[in-house]
Amino acid sequence: MKTFLVPLLTLLCVHTFAAEKTPLPTAHTTRNIEGWNVRVDDRLLSGDGAGAGERALKLLTARLVAITIVVPEQSLAKLRAISIELDLNYGDLRNMQYHPDAGWLKENGYSEQLAKCVHIPEVEDFLSPFENHRMPWVVLHELSHGYHDQVLGFDEPRITAAWKKFCDSGKYQSVLTSPGPMREHYGLTNPKEFFAEMTEAYFGSNDFYPFVTGELKQAEPETFALMAEIWGSLPARDKPKAAAKP
């Protein structure tokens, strides 16, 4: 009896796991939000998910508005060519991500239509108060992966060279993060994450030091100059208006 019990239990576990696996969305509605094509999971537009969908669309709109305000027009036009997909949930995927490879998607049972798109696979994670406080510019982070891939090329030598200097400096093995703990800088991972992290600090705020543009300019002046070269200059301070004559 024991020789048959283990396989039987294994089959039952596999069957239960398969039955509980989160389903993939079956239909989307495309909306234009601030110039981006956003494919919205229909489960977020009606039924039980409509409330979360409404909040997520408001949040995504706010994030995209912020990007349109600070990114120079020439670069912004190229960012807007990158589609975004917003889902209630999507299989085992949780974190927002950019999908560069249709082959990987196919191998893992996901839609190849996600290739070259920024994907928000779980609305609950997107609406997380902690994650929004920690990474308010994460949408730009993921869009910058698309820009790196589709506009510059992932083999862009200027970014690779800057990343190597960043790694070799030894300064980023343990840095302050926005929640407080010291951690290894995520930009050390590879040139792709380095570019996305530095882009967040250049235009907005990152969750690893250097957090904002002034700190980036002070700590990594060459990287700051590279961001300006690739993206364009930061917005200039508005000149004060002359007082009207009485």
Where do the language-model regions lie?
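Sec-dependent N-terminal signal peptides
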Residues: 4-14
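Boundary at the C-terminal end of the N-terminal hydrophobic targeting segment
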Residues: 16-20
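Metalloprotease/metallohydrolase-associated module, dominated by Zn2+-dependent proteases
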Residues: 24, 102-125, 129, 163-246
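Extracytoplasmic
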Residues: 26, 33, 79-81
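Acidic/histidine-rich, surface-exposed loop or edge segments in extracytoplasmic proteins
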Residues: 30-54
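Short N-proximal segments of mature Sec-exported proteins
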Residues: 36, 139, 193-197
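Acidic/His-rich structured neighborhood in mature extracellular/periplasmic domains
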Residues: 54-168, 224
